[in-house]
Amino acid sequence: MPLYEHVFLARQDASSQQVEELTNQITGVITGLGGKVTKTENWGVRSLTYRMKKNRKAHFVLLNIDGPAAVVSEIERQERIHEDVIRYLSIRVEEHEEGPSAMMRKADRDRERDDRGGGFRGDREGGFRGDRGPRRPREEAPAVVEE
């Protein structure tokens, strides 16, 4: 059977529980039509590049699907009708990616970066150019003597 990667975006004001129920509903449709979901990833609420249907953020969910084309057309039809789904995209792939997806690896990398602390150039002391050492003493101007 063909392999698909399917991503859908749910509205930001939908709760995590509602998104989980929507994911389970879609998974039920897939298994009911003879397909199977090999991996499900919830990427959480992320900012959108531009507004979609008056939303600036959305819940992102990835499904790896192994099933006939009729499965994909049916879940896309149901997502078109569902009011919580903003966008969806299904892509046919040659093989599914093993392990976490690129988005999950990026999230892990960002968490590691936050754990290091310090922010931008946190290892440096001082201001813009780091610690430059003490200033040299100022040379005094010669005193003007009036006669």
Curated annotation (Swiss-Prot):
GO terms for molecular function: small ribosomal subunit rRNA binding; structural constituent of ribosome. The keyword Ribonucleoprotein applies. One of its GO terms (cellular component) is cytosolic small ribosomal subunit. Disulfide bonds: none annotated. Transmembrane segments: none annotated. Keywords: Ribonucleoprotein, Ribosomal protein, RNA-binding, rRNA-binding. Residues 97-141 have a biased composition (Basic and acidic residues). GO terms for biological process: translation. Residues 97-147 are annotated as: Disordered. Belongs to the bacterial ribosomal protein bS6 family. PANTHER family: MITOCHONDRIAL 28S RIBOSOMAL PROTEIN S6 (PTHR21011), SMALL RIBOSOMAL SUBUNIT PROTEIN BS6M (PTHR21011:SF1). Binds together with bS18 to 16S ribosomal RNA. This is Small ribosomal subunit protein bS6. It comes from Nitrobacter hamburgensis (strain DSM 10229 / NCIMB 13809 / X14). The gene is rpsF.
